[in-house]
Amino acid sequence: MSTLSFKVLDLDFPAGSKNKTATLVTGESEALLVDAAFTRADGHRLAAEILDSGKTLTTVFVSHADPDFYFGAEVIADAFPDARFVATPIVIEHIQHSYEGKLKAWAALGPNLPTRLVDIEPLTGDLTLEGHTFQLKGGPDALPDRHYLWQAEHRALLGGVLLFQQEHVWVADTATPEARAAWIGQLDEMAFLEAELVVPGHRLPGTPADSSAISATRAYLLAFEEELDKAADGAALNDALVKRYPDNGMLIAAQIGAKVAKGEMKWG
């Protein structure tokens, strides 16, 4: 069986600010891509990475339904027409339901916006690459759209939207304490695996791809609950989070998440 290589690529989100990752996994002759970028430009950059690898792209796994996970997909599909795009059924449903609204929300991207949705096949089980199994894990009842991949031989965990490294954590889609508690439960499940490579869906470039992403995300979620109880409104909660995590990126996550948690804004 071949040995796999994992390359973590730092991409734009929002445009002009590198906070999103994609992961290119390569074997002897084939490649798997996890997540497909936020912009058409980054879609081209991913296509170039795949071409430079010299491997045949067989599968693209879209791990979540937010635009930074799939807006670049059409460029990759055009470059590699034989590659399969897969996602869990609920992620496909969310993408199809929200796509037009997300185009309007991110209209400032202009020509960097996608022009169409690619065909995405439902994934209900594990993925394989050259005989290596990537287990599809997660998706509890409280968070059915949140999965991650686990490759046991290489002790590699591709965490998607569940993991953040030195970023403000995106909590706007987990507006209740119950949802955030379920998230923490998934993080504890991840920690139990004792992974050696841990790829967060969002990170500041240069930060480590290891288990510290799990503990950092967990600590942030607990801090969010603590500051939420003390804050009078969304602005106060945002200020408290920024003060507590002055070096974290993705300030937009703190701003929007605080408003949603305080009932000042609806999201999704």
What is the role of each PLM region?
Residues 38, 133, 140-141, 146-215, ...:
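Metallo-beta-lactamase
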Residues 48-126:
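Active-site HxH/HxHxD metal-binding segment of metal-dependent hydrolases
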Residues 94, 192-197, 205-268:
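Accessory terminal helices/loops
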Residues 25, 35, 50, 64, ...:
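Divalent metal-coordination and catalytic microenvironments
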